[in-house]
């Protein structure tokens, strides 16, 4: 109860493939929650959805109109990405590009910086395959904390995705 939250019990999460955390970490977890989706606002939602299909092998599972804008549901790695278009009354601001700092990379803005996927395969070969397709990497392949291989992909709509070797 170090953080003053008595209703949550301490749990140990074991991630043997993520050695930069020493293989495990102590965390507080609330079993009432499960992860549902990432929602991306796009100027070109169908083109963006196609990019995730062509580059990462995502599957389009639904394509609807919600509040006057396209809303496309993708499945990738057992998770849902929702890409939707501009809705009347919105004035979305462009996302900042990710940039390198001395020892890390960041969008240097409040809010979501990036999301990440563990890649269960040869990340170096997948990186090369994406390069051949013209994908941009603001952070090229490198050894992360603890020695795991990682890179950052520039996805459509200013989205940054970290790929980590599982």
What are these regions, as identified by a protein language model?
Residues 40-90:
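Core segments of cupin and vicinal oxygen chelate
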């Amino acid at each position: 109860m170090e953080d003053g939250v008595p209703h949550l019990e301490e749990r140990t999460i074991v991630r043997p493939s993520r050695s930069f955390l020493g293989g495990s970490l102590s965390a507080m977890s609330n079993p009432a929650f499960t992860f549902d989706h990432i929602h991306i606002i796009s100027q070109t939602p169908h083109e963006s959805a196609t990019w995730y299909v062509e580059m990462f092998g995502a599957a389009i599972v639904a394509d609807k109109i919600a509040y006057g804008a396209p809303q496309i549901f993708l499945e990738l790695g057992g998770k849902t990405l929702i890409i939707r278009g501009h809705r009347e009354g919105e004035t979305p601001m462009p996302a900042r590009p990710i940039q390198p700092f001395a020892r890390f990379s960041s969008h240097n803005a409040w809010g979501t910086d990036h999301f990440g996927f563990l890649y269960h395969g040869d990340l170096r070969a997948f990186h090369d395959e994406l390069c051949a397709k013209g994908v941009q990497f603001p952070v090229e392949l490198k050894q992360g904390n603890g020695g795991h291989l990682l890179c950052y992909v520039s996805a459509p709509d200013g989205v940054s995705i970290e790929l980590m070797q599982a």
